[in-house]
Amino acid sequence: LFTRPRRFGKTLNMSMLQRFFEATAKSNAYLFDGLKIAAYPEYMAYQGQYPVISISLKSMKQASYTDAFYMYKNLIAKEYEKHKIILESNQILESEKEIFRNIMEQRADQNVYLNSIRTLSDILEKYYEKNVIILIDEYDVPLENAYHEGFYDCLLYTSDAADD
């Protein structure tokens, strides 16, 4: 959790962490050429080695719970789309692939979305056989907006249901 004042570079730092750790088809190592970290092989050994879930909730400023949830579904579906390579894997059960597809295509029930980040993390961990790095930027925007728009209690109730 990065707690810093506005305009302090949190988003930039999270983007840098994503590019450093994320396992991608094309290596991001060149982005760190000439930087001090590149001089440390013990750190560079971690570069490009982990699955990363990266979501920004900055756009979660809707006037109603329904609209906010619709936007959340879109954000989550886009993140699933980034990881759709796992659908080709034999390591992932067909039932897990079906859940994955339903979320990616925005056909899942509301309750499925409440745990969708955890579900994606579990599936990615199984596929890559490595821990997953989860980066959530602007995490406070949905709650702050819900408070100002009058659906804060509804949002909290929904988040309590996700914990069950």
Residue ranges and their predicted role:
Residues 2:
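Hydrophobic anchor at the beta1->P-loop junction of P-loop NTPases
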Residues 10:
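Conserved lysine of the Walker
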Residues 67, 71, 77-114, 142-148:
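Conserved P-loop NTPase mechanochemical-coupling segment
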Residues 130-149:
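Conserved P-loop NTPase "ATPase switch" module shared by AAA+ and STAND
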